[in-house]
Swiss-Prot record:
Official protein name in the record: Short-chain diamines transporter
Keywords for this protein: Antiport, Cell inner membrane, Cell membrane, Membrane, Transmembrane, Transmembrane helix, Transport
InterPro entries documented for this protein: BTP_bacteria (IPR007896)
A GO molecular-function annotation: antiporter activity
Claim: NAD is one of the keywords in the record: no
Amino acid sequence: MTRNERIFHAVLFELMALAIIVPAAALITGKGSSDLALVGIGLSLYTVVWNYIYNLYFDKWFGSNRADRSLAMRLGHTVGFEGGLIFISIPVIAWFLEITFLRALMLEAGFLVFFLFYATGFNWLYDKVQPFGKMRKLLV
């Protein structure tokens, strides 16, 4: 994956996730969508940077042929990625939403379950469809 494709991939991933998670979190927590959107955007920016670094090294260690990765490797990839997010997201969620650490942990657990399936499905579909290459061909 080129640097531009990595950025495209990360931004597309985050935008689609925010479109799903912000309304769902507003329903679950009773917090305003604007507060949740601010938290979501802040964590998404952090996530985009983490995504770029994590996937750059993951591809170096496990090969860059993403289309042939097994389900087990995809699940391992997702678990490792999400683990790196937990250490930042729980304190940020608790502080910004003014909730207890335990409630932030429970909310993060829900996000983790969502993203385990979302990331696995998104990355599988992205690798099969390869939208960046198709968009480049259309624009060139």
